């Protein structure tokens, strides 16, 4: 009896297998479209649960329409890399369809995909099509959709209710489209969204509260969006966010205010941004942060004091491949007890302080290879390392300085050199050698230096003033880190600024040459005159007397203008407290030389000249026809004749009068001008008689009179 029962059970198993085989055979043969592959394949749900699904694979067949003989049991339909641009009703009988892949086809509109009644669909791939917009309710029938991949399209417009009905959506890929704005209303219909990739869109900027409806979001990718700033409240509402990427943007500083609004962030990617320095407070009180990436930053030069502060769960920091990163403050880390891995390779670091490493009690591995290391007292701790810290790729750690050790392995050199003090060395990439600034801007020059003992840093201005942390000035301010701030830059602020790093062993210096609007004033030149504005009939000049001249002893300044055509020379005395002068009633398109001489009570003089050409005059007269021109010429000719006769009469009368009082003016006259005297500005100048008279009266005593400075522009 037992044998009979066992045999019966075996028959049932065989029969079941036969039925299953026949069913699968029908799917794989009679109902499988030509050239497609139909089979049972492993399939993972959006929650990564393993299942097996009936799959029809029609990828890469250059199809222009969906095959018509699809089985209603199809669960996964793969139509990637075809030429399909529109469907009719081929999908309507696929009631069990859970995944549909239309990527790399020719759809331009979502409605043409034919998604109605696909209530079981959980995953939809529409990437790499030609879709340009998403209209309201275009996906409303996909109530069970959990994954939507619509990246790498041409989408420039998404209506406010485009995602209506997608309350179960978990993953949304909108990256690599043409979106210029991010509308928070999109996300009102997707409260359960966990992953959002919206990078590589040319958005104008991120707004405050942009992602507020996404309280369940765990991962946000904002890569490649040309972002220059992140508003302080842009990430408000993302209380569940664990991973955030700002990879490959244009951020020039860490968006610290925005990051403080993401309390549960664990992974932060700031790689490939032009951030200049990591400053105090940039990463502070981020209590859940575990990994931080600041790699491939072309402009990063320093990690300053307390840049990473109170990060109790941070275990890994990557700061690699930063070609200008040359300085890490000895107190860069504070209250970072869990850090195990510190990657600092392929930078421009000369050293890492022992105190920096000692501030990380749980450090297990450090990578500082492929840096231009200085093999002196600053890195002696490497040779005397008594901890369990492991150096990554130690054979790639070579000395770059001092010159006698260049190219040798670090450990071999440190055995020979055991000095405890060494000279300061200014990090060469912290500030540029040359800069050109615009008038009115503010300049920051970051000077950083490493030495034992720690050096003092101060700056010297182009005129020799020493700027320290204690200096009180509206123009200059020096931070304890060594950053010089120059406010409201003017042309007279141009010149050579010298950073000095000094300790008991000596000093190191480095110079930054600053131009303002393309102008560079020589710091050794006490006086400098320059042109501020040029018009067709006027020139506005200004000058600067550097403060290392005893300006309190300067009694007079004189300006001499030489006019090439017509040739007129005059001088005018200007009080020292006037630094700007307007020379008017000049000739258009004419070359002039303006010279300024400054003298003190000891008769010491400084002279500065500038060449300038007035602009071409703008003529408003426009004669439209020949007859009008002829008539006008006749009238003007008549007027010219009358004026000429009158001028001759006046001239004869004046010559007659001149004979009567010639000697009373002789001491003021040297040369005759072809420009009317009453049109020259300033009005009080020294004149010379014509050459014929000058020969007769060459011995006359000439004394320039003081200029009426009430008509000059007083700026200081």
Curated annotation (Swiss-Prot):
Residues 653-716 are cytoplasmic. Residues 424-515 form the Ig-like C2-type domain. Disulfide bonds join 447-499. The keyword Ubl conjugation does not apply. Residues 371-424 form the LRRCT domain. Residues 702-716 have a biased composition (Polar residues). The chain crosses the membrane at residues 632-652. GO terms for cellular component: membrane. Residues 525-619 form the Fibronectin type-III domain. It comes from Mus musculus. CDD domains: FN3. This is Leucine-rich repeat neuronal protein 1. LRR repeats lie at residues 73-95, 96-117, 120-141, 144-165, 168-189, 192-213, 216-237, 240-261, 264-285. It comes from the Eukaryota. It is found in: Membrane. Gene3D superfamilies: Immunoglobulins (2.60.40.10), Ribonuclease Inhibitor (3.80.10.10). GO terms for biological process: positive regulation of synapse assembly. Expressed in brain. The lineage of its organism: Eukaryota, Metazoa, Chordata, Craniata, Vertebrata.
